[in-house]
Regions:
Chain B
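Glycine-centered hinge/linker elements that transmit conformational signals in sensory
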Residues: 188-193, 234-268
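Hinge/lid segment of periplasmic solute-binding proteins
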Residues: 81, 106-160, 215-216, 305-308
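Extracytoplasmic/periplasmic solute-binding protein
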Residues: 144-155, 160, 185-238, 283
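A structural signal for short loop-to-beta-strand junctions that line the ligand-binding cleft
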Residues: 101, 130-169, 316-323, 393-400
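Conserved C-terminal helix/tail region of periplasmic/extracytoplasmic solute-binding proteins
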Residues: 74, 78, 170, 355, ...
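Conserved N-terminal structural module of periplasmic/extracytoplasmic solute-binding proteins
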Residues: 19-111, 115, 129, 176-177, ...
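Extracytoplasmic/periplasmic substrate-recognition and gating elements
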Residues: 261, 298-363
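Short, solvent-exposed loop/beta-turn-alpha elements that line the ligand-binding surface or hinge
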Residues: 122-135, 179-180, 202, 223-250, ...
């Protein structure tokens, strides 16, 4: 064996050892996060998935019932209404993103009084969602201020029972969510805009680009990843975090006319009825999980395509 | 001398040790602490009591009396603001083995559904309590006369009725104290007269709190008049059909007709301020249980009257009655370490002396048969005395008969029938579907 060969073997042994050490480092670095994910994410999801195939009552009864919970829930007659409500409420996402961009651009360009606007626009975020829900319930109540104003200006025919009809009630809920969220959207987008060199905006202004052209030709194309984050975050939030708004404003009613999938999880688990149908509640949670995953994948693919165009 | 001194010292030390040991063994009793969950409304905590400091509440004072009578026992009061959630919380705590020793829950199906975590009281209830307290059927498993006793009926008896504003009724040309409407036709005609003077006849929040209050407190009486509680139980267990229950369908149809005729406030499915409106004279009637009487009398004074539901079918077996009874119970958790003491506490709260003491703070028709209205200090002909007449002739809560599936539909969708978004038959069929799936 030549000296070169020996040296080469030694080097390769050292290389393998280094690779092993590197792998061990990676493994040990990831281990805490993986363990946390396994315990706090994977285990509950797998348990919920398993429970969704049982008649679990939250206590001792947990017999295998196959797909019965899913089939019964879908066949209940209210499923499609609940799914429709859930999807209608997602309309708040494009609305809040659009208004968020408009507001962020105004703040970025430091219009007169921008400091006050920045503080005011974020205020709803620090108010409890339950309080916001109650405020909107009172404001849009049949005998509330909104209808009083309509009547005062001679539009009494428009003074309807806003929460008495599925579509108008959902419209009010969407409005309240947008009102609540535009501050957050504006701050997120404003944060993204700080990564765009000011010279780009200055050049656009010199070239005669107006406000809307700057919004649609500069901000949106250059902030695809930020918008992707805000759309996914808002979408997931809409699908899973609307409970306090619904509870305060409509309690999912009248009937199930403003109930959503996440509200149904509550109703099946804790609603009046005393049976505590946790089996069905977990089945609804699984359906919601699938919906969240599907919408996230679709949105990410669209964002990737948009980024490619950019 | 030295030996004697040493011996004496040892003897004193020995005697002192024995004395200390004996005193620590025999003199000190084991400390007993009971945790008690109490509903914050419609319970022995009255609605107006909560405006006072907690130590001035009747229940706090009763607890101090019990502690004084039972040295070594301490009671911890935990108020449950959300009664519906209290059931789930109790169940969850029971599963974990740390449920409160005593809990104030609803009678009927709500506690039947929790029997895995509730202690059977069959061998613990004193004979006198069984003799003098009414409403045991509401806490016996399955409503069977020999069913396991899952709890005590709570000390107050809730009698369903309608509170009404005498001034408005008088303005409409009627006097319900002398001549109350007793049939559906008379009731219809009376409500029409109230509407004619520009006042909403009945103000009610029929869905805002997830319960159709008018139906549960008034119309349920009409339903059970025609179907009977046994018939409703057959339906909820899936042995008969709600959709074939003529009494149920007729009651729902009348309920719908009341809305069409403008007898209810227009926004009854979304309103949540009806009691305030009633107290402010914006409505003539408000469906109620006894716990609201004190507040109404305080606001309306002599203009506050009570009206019992008219008879839907004057030829029915059940007449001159109303829905009610002890809607609340006291149960003992299976995991309690002190079952005897827990039952002793509940028995104490239901005792004649405590019932009389409670009446000084809250006024309720009671569940004891050995207390007269005179002992309670009720003026003959007063609203409370009128309601007390039904203390032993009430018809047990219909909605508490419903099992979870049909109950879910009943609570969430009955108001939709009133506003015409659902037909009576559709509601009944939906309840049947749930009953069949149980």
């Amino acid at each position: 064996m030549t000296h070169t060969t020996r040296a080469s073997l030694r080097d390769s042994a050292i290389g393998r050892k280094r690779t092993r050490i590197k792998r061990l480092e990676i493994f040990l670095s990831l281990l805490p996060v993986v363990l946390i994910l396994l315990v706090f994410r994977v285990y509950p999801i797998v348990t919920a998935l398993a429970k969704s195939f049982t008649n679990w009552d939250g206590l001792y009864r947990s017999d295998w019932v196959g797909l019965r919970n899913y089939v019964t829930f879908v066949q209940e007659g209210t499923f499609w209404m609940i799914l429709r409500n859930t999807l209608i409420l997602l309309l708040n996402v494009p609305l809040q993103v659009f208004i968020g961009i408009v507001v962020a651009l105004l703040l970025y360009e430091r219009v007169a009084g921008w400091r006050i606007y920045r503080a005011v626009i974020y205020t709803p975020q620090i108010i409890s969602a339950v309080i916001i829900g109650f405020l909107f319930k009172i404001f849009f109540g049949f005998e509330g201020p909104f209808n009083a104003v309509l009547k005062a200006v001679g539009l009494g025919t428009l003074a309807i029972e806003w929460f008495g009809n599925s579509y108008t009630a959902l419209g009010v809920i969407v409005f309240s969510i947008v009102w609540f969220s535009i501050g957050w959207q504006a701050i997120v987008i404003l944060g993204g805009m700080s990564s765009i060199p000011p010279s780009v905006f200055e050049a656009a202004v010199i070239d005669g680009a107006n406000y809307w052209q700057r919004a649609f030709r500069i901000v949106i194309p250059m902030l695809v990843r930020v918008l992707e984050f805000s759309i996914i975050a808002s979408g997931v939030w809409t699908l899973t975090q609307l409970f306090p708004f619904l509870f305060a404003m409509t309690k999912g009613g009248p009937g199930y006319e403003t109930s959503t999938l996440d509200y149904m999880i509550y109703l099946k688990s804790y609603g009046l009825g005393f049976g505590r149908d946790y089996g069905t509640a977990t089945a609804v949670a699984m359906i919601l999980l699938l919906l969240v995953l599907a919408l996230t994948v679709i949105e990410m693919r669209l964002a990737n395509r948009a980024d490619d165009w950019g | 001398m030295k030996r004697l001194f040493t011996f004496s010292l040892l003897l004193v030390f020995l005697l002192a040790s024995v004395a200390i040991t004996l005193s620590s063994c025999g003199g000190k009793k084991e400390a007993v602490k009971l945790t008690v969950w109490m509903n914050g409304a419609d319970s022995i905590i009255g609605p107006t009591e909560q405006q006072k400091p907690q130590d001035q509440w009747y229940v706090s004072q009763a607890f101090r009396r019990f502690e004084k009578a039972n040295p070594g026992v301490t009671l911890e009061l935990v108020v449950q603001a959300d009664q519906g959630a209290a059931h789930t919380n109790f169940k969850t705590a029971g599963l974990a083995g740390n449920a409160p020793d005593v809990a104030n829950l609803w009678t009927g199906q709500p506690i039947f559904a929790l029997k895995e975590v509730i202690l059977s009281l069959d061998k613990l209830v004193p004979a006198d309590d069984l003799k003098y307290i009414v409403g045991w059927e509401s806490v016996r498993d399955g409503f069977k006369p020999d069913g396991t006793i899952l709890g005590y009926p709570a000390a107050q008896n809730q009698i369903c009725h309608m509170l009404y504003n005498k001034a408005i009724v008088k303005k409409a040309g009627m006097d319900w104290e002398a001549n109350p409407p007793r049939t559906i036709e008379e009731f219809d005609s009376a409500l029409a007269k109230i509407k004619a003077i520009g006042v909403t006849p009945i103000v009610v929040d029929e869905a805002a709190q997830g319960v159709p209050w008018f139906f549960c407190w008034v119309a349920d009486y009409w339903w059970t008049q025609m179907t009977t509680n046994d018939g409703i139980l057959e339906e909820t267990y899936g042995r008969k059909k709600f959709a074939e229950d003529k009494g149920f369908l007729a009651t729902l149809a009348y309920y719908r007709s009341m809305y069409v005729k403008g007898f209810f406030r227009k926004d009854l499915t979304t309103a949540n301020d009806s009691f305030t409106q009633f107290l402010n004279g914006k409505g003539a009637l408000w469906p109620a249980v006894t716990s609201f009487l004190a507040d109404a009398e305080k606001s309306l004074g002599a203009d506050c009257g009570v009206l019992l539901p008219p008879e839907f079918d004057p030829n029915a077996k059940l007449v001159n009655s109303t829905v009610g009874g002890p809607g609340q119970s006291f149960v003992v958790a299976k995991n309690t370490k002190y079952p005897q003491m827990a039952v002793k506490l509940i028995s104490f709260l239901n005792s004649k002396a405590e019932v009389l003491a409670a009446q000084k703070i809250n006024r309720y028709p009671i569940v004891r048969t050995d207390v007269t209205p005179e002992e309670m200090g009720w003026v003959p002909g007063s609203n409370i005395a009128k309601l007390h007449k039904y203390s032993t002739t009430y018809n047990y809560w219909v909605d508490n008969l419903l099992t979870s599936g049909p109950a879910e539909i009943f609570y969430t969708q009955t108001s939709l029938v009133a506003v015409g978004k659902m037909t009576p038959l559709q509601l009944a069929e939906a309840m049947d579907k749930k009953a069949a799936a149980q």
